[in-house]
């Protein structure tokens, strides 16, 4: 069972991609986002219902519905990756609250749109490597 869960997480996080090359991705980390004014105008800013955690996932997903979202391999970011929601109960509560809001908004187990986004990105990135 543990192996099955780990495999689903690996696929969900797209860990098998080569992040040393530019890739179109459906979800971007909020620690560094650059976007066109046009995208913000059409898609809006961060959803204020998410106080912490998953606000970047929600925003980049909305942008990806209408625009390309790209991970640029040449960029470098230093992030104090602490996973506080794994260490502090108060942070875990915030994380779980945001996760519930996110899944209520986008779907829980069967998120067909996310599955389709991932499929298209896989095809697009594979085609770039073949060419």
Describe the predicted segments one by one.
Residues 1-25:
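Short, flexible, basic/aromatic active-site loop/helix in glycosyltransferases
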Residues 12, 50-51, 102:
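Aromatic-residue hotspot detector
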Residues 18, 26-45, 49-76:
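A short, conserved alpha-helix in the catalytic core of glycosyltransferases
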Residues 24, 28, 52, 85-92:
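Alpha-helix initiation/capping motif
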Residues 58-61, 65-131:
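Active-site-adjacent helix/loop segment of glycosyltransferases
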């Amino acid at each position: 069972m543990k192996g099955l869960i780990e495999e689903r997480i690996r696929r969900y996080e797209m860990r098998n991609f080569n992040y040393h090359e530019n890739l179109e991705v459906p979800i971007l980390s909020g620690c560094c986002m650059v976007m066109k004014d046009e995208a913000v105008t059409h898609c809006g800013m961060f959803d204020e219902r998410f106080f912490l955690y998953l606000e970047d996932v929600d925003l980049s997903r909305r942008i990806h519905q209408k625009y390309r979202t790209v991970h640029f391999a040449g960029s470098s970011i230093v992030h104090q990756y602490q996973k506080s929601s794994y260490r502090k109960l108060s942070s875990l509560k915030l994380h779980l609250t945001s996760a519930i809001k996110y899944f209520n908004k986008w779907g829980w187990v069967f998120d067909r749109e996310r599955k389709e986004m991932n499929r298209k990105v896989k095809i697009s990135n594979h085609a770039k490597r073949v060419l």
